[in-house]
Amino acid sequence: MHRMEQRLEIEQFICRSDNYGVLIHDPESALTATIDAPDAYAIEAALERRGWTLDFIFTTHHHLDHVEGNEPLKEKFGVSIIGPEAEKAKIPGIDRTVKGGDEFTFGLFKVKVISTPGHTAGGISYYLPDAKVVFTGDTLFALGCGRLFEGTPATMFHSLEKLVALPGDTALYCGHEYTQNNARFALTIDPDNSALKERAKEIARLRAHERMTLPSTIALEMATNPFLRWHDRTIRARLGLQDAPDEAVFAEIRKRKDMF
């Protein structure tokens, strides 16, 4: 089967309180990876549901709620743990380090590493172009972006620029189910955006039934996520930043979210 025809299977679930667990599986090679390891028990349960065994952990950043399952999963499955070079000292059990611009293979799929610091100093995202999917950890959320624990607004802005350069039909998976709260904030920044208003209603319907709001797409985020709409004239006018650099518009939106 030609690579472009091969389907990546994805199993997504909520764990801890609001973390997303995400397993990816290549049926051709029977390889399975988890994007981060927030909860070993939840990941094991998902593997059992699907009849998969775990081969890899792809770590996006070092925060405990993304790596706490590393060592128990490694002990049980003998997985190989891949993670950011810049954070290797903080990632339990890491076997292989990668950095922005690196590529490796996962079964039939090419994995491109994108350097996306800001939330942490060395955070990365994993992009699988043949599957049209990107895993952004806590850098880009549905209708939001990560808090700047170890980076500056400029750092995060440049990371987001890399992600919005991906094809619009790229599916987005991120680290947390924060979407409904993000929608409430987004409407304070971009209240006249009809696409955002409709999306907020759909998110409310989903969450009322405890359903997941992801995946999103890069195109949907560019149309509705205020953290990616630094170019929008209406938003700029609302912020009083009509002629400001894009980076300054983003920084003001991030500042307002921190106080929301």
UniProtKB/Swiss-Prot annotation:
Q: Which reaction does it catalyse?
A: an S-(2-hydroxyacyl)glutathione + H2O = a 2-hydroxy carboxylate + glutathione + H(+)
| Bilayer-spanning residue ranges | none
What is the top-level taxon of the source organism? Answer: Bacteria
SUPFAM superfamilies documented for this protein: Metallo-hydrolase/oxidoreductase (SSF56281)
Q: List the disulfide bonds.
A: none
A Pfam family of the record is HAGH_C
Q: Where does Zn(2+) 2 bind?
A: D65, H66, D138, H176
Q: What is its EC number?
A: 3.1.2.6
Q: Name one GO molecular function term.
A: hydroxyacylglutathione hydrolase activity
Cite the cofactor comment: Binds 2 Zn(2+) ions per subunit.
UniProt-annotated binding residues for Zn(2+) 1: H61, H63, H119, D138
Which keywords does the record carry? Answer: Hydrolase, Metal-binding, Zinc
Q: Which GO terms describe its biological process?
A: methylglyoxal catabolic process to D-lactate via S-lactoyl-glutathione
Q: Does the keyword Hydrolase apply?
A: yes
Q: Which cofactor does it need?
A: Zn(2+)
Q: In which pathway does it act?
A: Secondary metabolite metabolism; methylglyoxal degradation; (R)-lactate from methylglyoxal: step 2/2
The record describes its quaternary structure and partners as:
Monomer.
According to its UniProt record, which protein family does this protein belong to?
Belongs to the metallo-beta-lactamase superfamily. Glyoxalase II family.
Summarizing the function annotation, the protein's role is: Thiolesterase that catalyzes the hydrolysis of S-D-lactoyl-glutathione to form glutathione and D-lactic acid.
What is the recorded name of this protein? Hydroxyacylglutathione hydrolase
Gene that this sequence comes from: gloB
